[in-house]
Amino acid sequence: KWQIIDGLQRIGTIKEYVVEQKFSLTGMEFLKNLDGLKFDELPRSLQRRIEETNLNAYLVNPSTPKNVKFNIFKRINTGGLVLAPQEIRNALYQGTSTKFLLQMSNTREFIEATDYSIKKDRMLDREFCLRFVCFTQLNLDNYNGIMEDFLNQGMEYLNGATEEKLYQIQDKFKKTMKICKQIFGKFAFRRLNTEERRGPVNKALFETWSIIIYKMNDSDVQKLIDKRKELCEEFTVLCGDYSFQNAIRATDKTSVKTRISKIGKLVEKILDTGDEV
């Protein structure tokens, strides 16, 4: 039994037309004389041409590690509309993970926190949700500096998670998104600047603020919300820091730890001064 990673719709269409004969040709741009014909009704020369056409396929051994499969497919995925990395994951890790990420990406809290700006095409919204899962559920000490490997691990983690665990993740995800929206408004997960120009949602900031807020207790969260003006002012300064800018541009282990550390210290500073203001 083979698992089709790419081309499922095309192969399925061929099967339905040639083998099962479930439909007739309609809306032909060329060869309009074939409109309305099923496969058996085509001229014999065309039937033979279709039946004798070779299909190229890459077969990967089932025992091949998922990360290797991911990299193999990424290398051969060059024709037509090239799949985005999350679309490849969606094909390789079918199951609980794919359904759960779809649910997460459709939550009102996520959509509003990102201000309707994360596109659903190419599954970019699901990749953001997967990043939340990875940074809040996986051990960052084991992060090898390759983000794609880390995200693949997240898919495997979700496929093995219990219903109770999935509920907990989604519940905390919604709360985290809501808090970030309360604090930053339309600037959530974006770099801040003194001109109040709004840039795009930044993946690195999404990951970092997610893990920081996720780990906070309710009391500290409320303090942060109460001190959001001061927090935003301090974060604006941090966004202008050259080393921090470099840290949110890269995905190596040092950069990931640096941005989490810098924002973590910023939050601690705000919480420590909260009672004095």
Spans of features found by a protein language model:
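C-terminal hydrophobic structural anchor segments
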Residues: 190-242
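Small-side-chain structural scaffolding
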Residues: 13, 57, 91, 176, ...
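Amphipathic alpha-helical interaction surfaces
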Residues: 17, 135-139, 157-160, 183-186, ...
